[in-house]
Swiss-Prot record:
Every HTH psq-type domain range: 6-57
Protein name per its UniProtKB record: Tigger transposable element-derived protein 1
CC per GO annotation: nucleus
SUPFAM superfamilies: Homeodomain-like
Annotated gene: TIGD1
DDE-1 domain mapped to chain residues: 178-403
Region span, Disordered: 550-591
DNA-binding region(s), residue ranges: 33-53, 103-142
Main location (coarse class): nucleus
Record-annotated HTH CENPB-type domain positions: 70-149
Cell location: Nucleus
Species of origin: Homo sapiens (Human)
Length: 591
């Protein structure tokens, strides 16, 4: 019996390097530790230990050579480092739906190798690399890039296919009986969430200082809506950190975005499938129910590698249609102005918040020092709030107008959105003047376009270095734990009183009764949920206190003696009322 128990214990705790590698791979694809544990039949603690020490285990893999493995040659470290950067470039290209070919990848590999060799100087002087066909085939196998063509050149946007596709799509819509409310499109976009126009002093200072560059900190957003424009999907945000410091006190499921992560901050097939089954399906089903329309959906997506074809077979009610290759830049609705409009709103909202922060800063510092203080404290949480506000700001006319090329028969009233971006850019320039920043309209255009530009070699090297830095930060002990802020009853009472005092203050200083009264009601209604929590907690406290313990705290009247009984029974000639009993206020123990 003992031997059986020990063997079971061993099977639970003894892991092979292949198992550890599988855990790390699934984690980097965005799967949670609990999900990994369920899939592999392991405890979450075990998964956490491996994932948090991934660098250590990866070194083990490099040094481990199975007995039945024949060592052909030791791989060049410079080539291995180059390939890591090359993978980032390939993923960046495919995420932008830019077709690739063998020759393009070979040329890029050679360029990256020569740049890295020159940077390393004498220590890499003897290193050699030929981007041969044999190397390409081995690299493709190692990196699991099975969809890259081994021959031929990459194709440009297919104008002919784009011209004929709307007719084919119209037939699908007609046969399925889909309305504008039932047709959806989603698309990913790379997003630099903490980036200033290049000519501002903040951008110049960051460029001159070595080390981490906040302006190069990139995330991926998935944005989508229906053709009617009356239903925006909750943005999905993919970051490279599972638990950023700014989010430590927040339950991620309550954020205004669907927060996901992997080490490269990119969409994967696993993440997209999870989004499709866990969020999109139940959300659009609820929407159809509320609108009293049949639950049948047409979802249009591009041919990105992160969009698996298996989605077409999951739900009968959701018809997943892949647009023709190399047509998304011409046809895909989200790419026709929704994403660019959203990004312009994000920039304007960022500048608005900077101005508000400077106005509320009562320190004696200059305008530039106040702006630097604001920008230094601008976190991923602030970015998430900005994403929420900017996505809410995208108008119905923009959401519907971008479908004009794809389904012209369903989109009748079309209002342009380009003027909207131009107006927002003009607003940014005006706010920049108040912030003492050098910003011209072309600077705003350059920044908005930079999100979609292909990464330069310098940016690729920098992103690889920052990725390693974040991996080291994530692997430190204790990062897996998240501390949730406690909302105490005492704090609730304090802040509720502050709001009530503010409402009373406006009424006191404003001679316009209607205005102050309206504001007072709005303030009171806005915190109704917190009042409810507060009163419920007070009620619970009262119920916990027993009736007998309550009365024991009240002053006890003296027991009458026999001598005083007769006297007390005589009517009093005094009109003085007896002193009231002291009331004891119940207080919460430790909150």
């Amino acid at each position: 019996m003992a031997s059986k128990c020990s063997s079971e214990r061993k099977s639970r705790t003894s892991l092979t390097l292949n198992q550890k590698l599988e855990m790390i791979k699934l984690s980097e694809e965005g799967m949670s530790k609990a999900e990994i544990g369920r899939r592999l039949g392991l405890l979450r603690q075990t998964v956490s230990q491996v994932v948090n020490a991934k660098e250590k285990f990866l070194k083990e893999v490099k040094s481990a050579t199975p007995m039945n493995t024949r060592m052909i040659r030791k791989r060049n470290s410079l080539i291995a480092d180059m390939e890591k950067v090359l993978v980032v470039w390939i993923e960046d290209q495919t995420s932008r739906n830019i077709p690739l070919s063998q020759s393009l990848i070979q040329n890029k590999a050679l360029t990256l190798f020569n740049s890295m060799k020159a940077e390393r100087g004498v220590e890499a002087a003897e290193e050699k690399f030929e981007a041969s066909r044999g190397w390409f085939m081995r690299f493709k196998e190692r990196s699991h890039f099975h969809n890259i063509k081994a021959q031929g050149e990459a194709a440009s946007a297919d104008v002919e296919a784009a011209a004929s596709y709307p007719e084919a799509l119209a037939k699908i819509i007609d046969e399925g009986g889909y309305t504008k409310q039932q047709i959806f499109n989603v698309d990913e976009t790379a997003f630099y969430w903490k980036k200033m126009p290049s000519r501002t002093f903040i951008a110049r200072e960051e460029k001159s200082v070595p080390g981490f560059k906040a302006s190069k900190d990139r995330l991926t957003l998935l944005l989508g809506a229906n053709a009617a424009g009356d239903f925006k999907l909750k943005p999905m945000l993919i970051y490279h950190s599972e638990n950023p410091r700014a989010l430590k006190n927040y339950t991620k499921s309550t954020l205004p975005v669907l927060y996901k992560w992997n080490s490269k901050a990119r969409m994967t097939a696993h993440l997209f499938t999870a989004w499709f089954t866990e969020y999109f399906k139940p959300t659009v089903e609820t929407y159809c129910s509320e609108k009293k329309i049949p639950f049948k959906i047409l979802l249009l997506i591009d041919n990105a590698p992160s969009h698996p074809r298996a989605l077409m077979e999951i739900y009968e009610e959701i018809n997943v249609i892949f647009m023709p290759a190399n047509t998304t830049s011409i046809l895909q609705p989200m790419d026709q102005g929704v994403i660019s409009t959203f990004k312009s709103y994000y920039l304007r909202n960022t500048f608005h918040k900077a101005l508000a922060a400077m106005d509320s800063d009562v320190s004696d510092g200059s305008g530039q020092s106040k702006l630097k203080t604001f920008w230094k404290g601008f976190t991923i949480l602030d970015a998430i709030k900005n994403i929420r506000d900017s996505w809410e700001e995208v108008k119905l006319s923009t959401l519907t107008g971008v479908w004009k090329k794809l389904i012209p028969t369903l989109i009748d009233d079309y209002e342009g959105f380009k003027t909207s971006v131009e107006e927002v850019s003009a607003d940014v320039v005006e706010i920049a003047k108040e912030l003492e920043l050098e910003v011209e309209p072309e600077d705003v255009t350059e920044l908005l376009q930079s999100h979609d530009k292909t990464l330069t070699d310098e940016e690729l090297f920098l992103m690889d270095a920052q990725r390693k830095w974040f991996l080291e930060m994530e692997s430190t002990p204790g990062e897996d734990a998240v501390n949730i802020v406690e909302m105490t009853t005492k704090d609730l009472e304090y802040y509720i009183n502050l709001v009530d005092k503010a409402a009373a203050g406006f009424e006191r200083i404003d001679s316009n009764f209607e205005r102050s009264s309206t504001v007072g009601k709005m303030l009171s209604n806005s915190i109704a949920c917190y009042r409810e929590i507060f009163h419920e907690r007070k009620s619970q406290l009262m119920r916990k206190a027993s009736p007998m313990s309550y009365f024991r705290k009240l002053p006890q009247p003296p027991q009458p003696s026999a001598a005083t009984t007769l006297t007390s029974q005589q009517p009093s000639t005094s009109r003085q009322d007896p002193p009231p009993a002291k009331r004891v206020r119940l207080t919460e123990g430790s909150d």
